[in-house]
């Protein structure tokens, strides 16, 4: 279901808004706080999956017994795992229905301030730092982001996150007011079926 309907009488095939309109929507929010995002649980399974994907199997992330004698006393998530949550968490802070493609472009002024214990919950706060229309149909949006751990006073990390967006052909102006908690991009799709094995005679020259 779309976030906002097209204006009545909109010509078929014409966008309800332009990229400049979307840029203006963000420009009016420069300096304003967005959020917080919904809470997100940092599960042991997710941390283990990240460890396997990045080959970072340090005991402070995976071994509760050894982590107990380490600097944090409990297993903690990888710093880059927490960074990897930023696009997902910040995508809940504004209406994403106009977005076709979202690209991570830059991370600046990244600071890891406190550890994120495995099993804790995190959420994001952000402020719009800047916005501009770039060549080839991209909108650049810079968010100053703080990732917060439930129960902690200090952010786990802070950073400036720059993303490039392209606009859907049928986009409408982002909705104002409370933001529906809808994730962009959509949830993980079901695994694709395995390809059929090639005939044996096709494998020989």
Regions found by a protein language model. Give the residues of each.
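Hot-dog-fold acyl-thioester-processing enzymes
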Residues: 2-7, 11-104, 168-191, 198-205
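Intrinsic-disorder/low-complexity, polar/charged segments enriched in Ser/Thr/Lys/Arg/Asp/Glu/Gln
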Residues: 33-37, 41, 121-123, 140, ...
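Short linear functional motifs in flexible/disordered or boundary regions
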Residues: 62, 98, 122, 138, ...
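Hydrophobic beta-sheet segments that form the core/acyl-binding groove
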Residues: 103-150
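Short alpha-helical linear motifs
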Residues: 110, 126-129, 164-168, 183-186
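Flexible glycine-rich active-site/ligand-binding loops centered on an Asp-His dyad
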Residues: 142-150, 154-173, 177-181
